[in-house]
Curated annotation (Swiss-Prot):
GO molecular-function terms, A-Z: DNA binding; DNA-binding transcription factor activity; fatty-acyl-CoA binding
Species, as recorded: Proteus mirabilis (strain HI4320)
Name of the featured protein: Fatty acid metabolism regulator protein
Gene: fadR
One of the GO BP terms on file: regulation of fatty acid metabolic process
Domain of life, per lineage: Bacteria
Subunit structure: Homodimer.
Keywords: Activator, Cytoplasm, DNA-binding, Fatty acid metabolism, Lipid metabolism, Repressor, Transcription, Transcription regulation
Domain HTH gntR-type, residue spans: 6-74
Subcellular location(s) of the protein: Cytoplasm
Calcium as UniProt keyword: no
GO cellular component terms attached to this protein's record: cytoplasm
Length: 239
């Protein structure tokens, strides 16, 4: 087990999460008692308590007063906020995880972008206004792309779409920094934003879904070309 965390709390959190992932503490099992676990990890019981509470909030554990702490089946109890952690823990499944992420983005954005153009065209055009060119960095493109999708999600008038994008941010922007290191990816994105802005200006909501789905297909092709070889840590990608 290789743990990169620097602080005692960070170390304890990574230790427990990796132990759950690797079935040292399998779903449905009971965690060791606080004293035993704190000695095993090498942190104080106060630090351990804070970590356990945080992991319970994220869905990894169930803590009930007077009862032992139970390990959850995190796929059933956690939220989108664990995606980055899962990507770090299981590099072999990262391509599949990201394929699923992109499919979800395409499917829900086809709905909320159309709704945003109907309900809030002025705000939508404001969100789509940018000054980027292919000369801008992958980091800048990743941030812009995320902000455009998130901005249009909130412009739809249904904040739940925005909250979903909030939950995806960590993994989304990490993937984006790698994806937008490719010039074709930048060119395709700029063309997509331009097409969306034109549809919004023309109040043409009928063709939004086709536009989004086509972008999903074309960006998916570029992504699959970039997957070999995929960096072991997307955070190490040149920005």
């Amino acid at each position: 087990m290789v743990i990169k965390a620097q602080s005692p709390a960070g170390f304890a959190e990574e230790y427990i999460v990796e132990s759950i992932w690797n079935n040292r503490f399998p779903p449905g099992s009971i965690l060791p008692a606080e004293r035993e676990l704190s000695e095993l990890i090498g942190v104080t019981r106060t630090t351990l308590r804070e970590v356990l509470q945080r992991l319970a909030r994220d869905g990894w554990l169930t803590i009930q007063h007077g009862k032992p702490t139970k390990v959850n089946n995190f796929w059933e109890t956690s939220g989108l906020n664990i995606l980055e952690t899962v990507a770090r823990l299981d590099h072999d499944r990262v391509p599949q995880l990201i394929d699923n992420l992109l499919a979800v983005r395409t499917n829900i954005s086809a709905i909320f972008i159309r709704t945003a153009f109907k309900n809030n065209p002025e705000k939508s055009l404001e969100v789509l206004t940018h000054q980027l060119t292919t000369e801008n960095s992958a980091d800048e493109f990743s941030e812009l792309d995320y902000n455009i999708f998130r901005g249009l999600a909130f412009a739809s008038g249904n904040p739940i779409y925005g909250l979903i994008l909030n939950g995806l941010k960590g993994l989304y922007t990490r993937v984006g920094r790698y994806y937008f290191s490719n010039v074709q990816a930048k060119e395709l994105a700029l063309s997509f934003y331009k097409k969306l802005a034109l549809l919004c200006e023309q109040k043409d909501t009928e063709h939004v879904m086709d536009c989004v789905r086509q972008y999903g297909k074309e960006s998916g092709i570029i992504w699959h070309e970039l997957q070999s070889p995929l960096p072991s840590d997307l955070e190490e990608v040149k920005r």
